Amino acid sequence: EEALQSGNVDAIAATSMRKTNNERIVDKFDSSDFYVIVKKGNTELLNEINYAIDQMNAVEGDWKTTLYNKNYESIQTKNLEYTEKEKSIISQYSKDNPLHVLCDPTRYPYSYNENGEMKGIIPDYFRKIADYAGISYEFLTPATRDEYIAYQKNKETTDISIDARLETDNYAETKKWGITAPFITMQLARVTRRDFDGKINVVTTVDQTASNSIEDAMAPGAEKLMCSTRQEMMEAVRKGKADAAFVYYYMAQAFVNSDTTGTMTYTLLEQPTFTYRMVVSSTENHALAGILTKAMYAMPQNLVEDLAARYTTYK
């Protein structure tokens, strides 16, 4: 650090857990987990600590980021500057050559197609970071999930998919994709009627292609009622055709808060969770993923929650 401040070196690699002074962050990379260590055999204390962390995860929101921002974040760490090379890449996406953007039209309120316009939490979030970076873009407008999947397979049409759930980073490498940092972690919720007795005999689903679906894990042995969309899944529960539906949290919240019958409720589940990234096509410059990631770091801490409130608040 002294060498950097004195000008003896041009750049250093350092931990993010430090205050910055007269520095410019060029890039962030890699991460390491921190652990609480107890004396070997002290399982009682270990269980208490794990329980406390679970409770914080359940009720304190993104407390890790809150603590980090309180102790380490500064204007310099939040506003990452683009290099000359990155600025050159950004300039390639003009109004005459916009970035073609894809997202699923069947995941209200996360993303949906309304009269030929892509709306929802994820499209709104992308607009924020693309505008911050100065990238011109144009949303593709699939009306159905089948059209969405067809767009996914068409490299000539789709430049970036903004709602990718990847099992591993290695999978992206095999596809020669560029990937951003995660920008949203989705939790599941169980949607039921208020008179639910706790036993799931029939569960709704939209996907039986996976050998081990969410419904298999959450309601083993239950009969599956196939639906076309997740909205239909929750409607089937409201009509008494099924006992439960498992959907992403904001889907459940929006559905229940807009329900005028007062018969529906949802329960937030701690596990499993699903992390989403944006995926740059193999035909585009992968540096674009880093450009968008820098824009993500510059966004307000609670941006996703604030965007979600527009769609999920009781009206």
Set out the residue ranges of the language-model regions.
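Extracytoplasmic small-molecule ligand-binding "clamshell" domains
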Residues: 1-10, 49, 60-66, 87-169, ...
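Secondary-structure boundary/capping residues
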Residues: 62, 138, 223-224, 261-265, ...
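Broad hydrophobic/π-residue packing in well-ordered secondary structure
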Residues: 36, 67-71, 107-112, 118-121, ...
